[in-house]
Amino acid sequence: MYVLVRKKGNKMKKLVKLIIVLVLVMVSGCTTQKKEENARIIDTSMFLYKVSNQEGKYSYLFGTFHPGRYPIKSLDKVTEKALDESDSIYLECDMKPSPKETEEITKYNTYNSIRDLGLEDKYENLMKQYKSLKGKPGYALYNVFVINSLINSDPEVLNKANISKFSAIDNYIYEYAQKKKNFKEVEGIEFQMKLLTELSGDYSETILDNLANKEMVIKSAKEDLDAYYSGNTQYYEDEQNLLLNQLEQLNDSDKEKYEKYWDILAYNRNIHMKDTLADSIHNNKHDFIGVGCKHLYGKKGIIQLLKDDGYLVECMK
């Protein structure tokens, strides 16, 4: 697939990069939160939206981000107020599953393993590049998404992209919800693991090829996090629309392959997330629904889907 990318030129290369970035962001989540010195107030109000129906009933939609950057003292007053007044606080999945749940989901780590797919040579190339994989040939027994998670914890990636695995926004929200005892899942970890397993058979080689471009991995992670912490929502809007526009320009066979990937990983989930929020409003609840910010934006993002259904979507910044 790497040769295919080079032959097809910049459009295909950019498209694959954008699609792979979706995976990198999605499966690098579930970090931990701990007390750190120099904690600061993080303004996330530009990613907070009040969603209302024609009767004025509303819930909140929030775009979160899995990797963190700065120690968190609190979020801005607007977001904190929305959290405080919400009946339930939703995130994509439980950050601290029970031992039984953990045992259930770990079985997915070996489905479509690198070894089973005959891709050990590509994994060996990654071992040479990333300290988190160095000297660990046994990790070929896992699938590509486990390897991706390990790469997202690689010391060089964390350092150069300015990532802190202890300061994630969604973990702050999760702990807030645990104190209020009102946490709910939008999807659940097992759902996400099944989804990734479904993708891993057909797309592992492509993902491994892109992970081999360490410079791109670091650059993409840094750009995404820079955009979030600077409140640049237009970055995500442009990125998602560029991806969709480039999908339309592919030949039929490539278009079918990558549209399937996009639908499974993003669009179908966007619809489910939109429906979760709509159900909240319909049931007269004031809920706070936080999902990865990339799900919110673009022509097929949650915000546009809600507008298409007649909801008023207002940024709280």
Regions found by a protein language model. Name each.
Residues M1-K11:
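Short, Lys/Arg-enriched N-terminal segments with co-localized hydrophobic residues
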Residues K13-V21:
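Sec-dependent signal peptide recognition
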Residues V27-G29:
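C-terminal motif of bacterial Sec signal peptides marking the signal peptidase cleavage site
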Residues T31-Q33:
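Bacterial signal peptide processing site
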Residues E36-A39, L48-K257, Y261:
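Structured, acidic catalytic/metal-binding patches in enzyme active sites
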Residues I41, I72, A266-N270:
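A conditional alpha-helix N-cap/helix-loop micro-motif detector
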Residues T44-Y49, M273:
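Alpha-helical scaffolding within the catalytic cores
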Residues K255-K317:
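A cross-kingdom marker for long, charged
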